[in-house]
C-alpha cells in the first residue's frame, strides 16, 4: 500500500524516534511512504486563531500534494490530523475561501480539489492492514505487558469529523493492544486532554491535569502508556518528573509511541525503535 506521509514537526524534532520508528514499522508492514520534503507545519492550533487564511493555505497545500499524486495522506500526530480534517470541512463549506486558497496555491502549480483522504496511522493499522494480517505479522506477543491507552482529545473530538472514531468512548488502541498480546488497563483519563497547548501559558495547570491522568492509570495497574500523538507524548513523558513532584508520589510510567509498541510486537528491538530517547526509561517484560 502506498501512502503520502506527513510526519509533522514534533516527529522531526523533539520526537525524532516517532518518525524513525514509523518508517521502520511501515517497511515491516509493506507500506510505501511518500514524504513531501517541502511540507510545512499545519499551524498547530495557534495559527488558526491569529491568521485563519494562512491556516487554510498551509493545510490545503499539503492536501493538494497528496491529491496530485492520488494518495491518501497518513498522519502520526493528532493535532495535524484534526487540522487537516478541519480544513477539509471548512473549504467544503466556504467556496470563496476555497477559491482564495487555490489562488495562493497556483503560484506553486498546486490546486486543492477537495478529494483528500486523511488517515491517522492508527486507522491504517486497523482498517487497511487489518486485524487478521496484524495477528499473522506479530512475532513477539506483548504478553505480560499491562498498558494504558492515552488517546488525547484531538483524535476523538469533535466526533463529527471522525468516521472511524464516532465517539469519545472509542476502543481502537485497546483493540490493538489485544492484537499485539498486551492487556489494556481501563482508567478515567484515557480520552482527556494532555495539556500540551495549555502548557505554553499555564505549565502548572498542565502538570496538575496530566499528573492526575497518569496517577489514575498507574493506580489501575498500568506498567506503561501508549499514545498516538507526539504532543501528548511530550507532555506525558518529559513533564513526568514535575508531575511526580506535584503529586508527591513516584510514577515511573514509560510513555510509548504507537509505532514503537507495534514495532516491539513485530520483532524490532527497543534500540532500533530509539526508545532510549525517552525521559522515562522502561524495560518491557517481553
Where are these regions (language model features)?
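Iron-sulfur cluster-binding electron-transfer modules in prokaryotic oxidoreductases
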Residues: 1-286
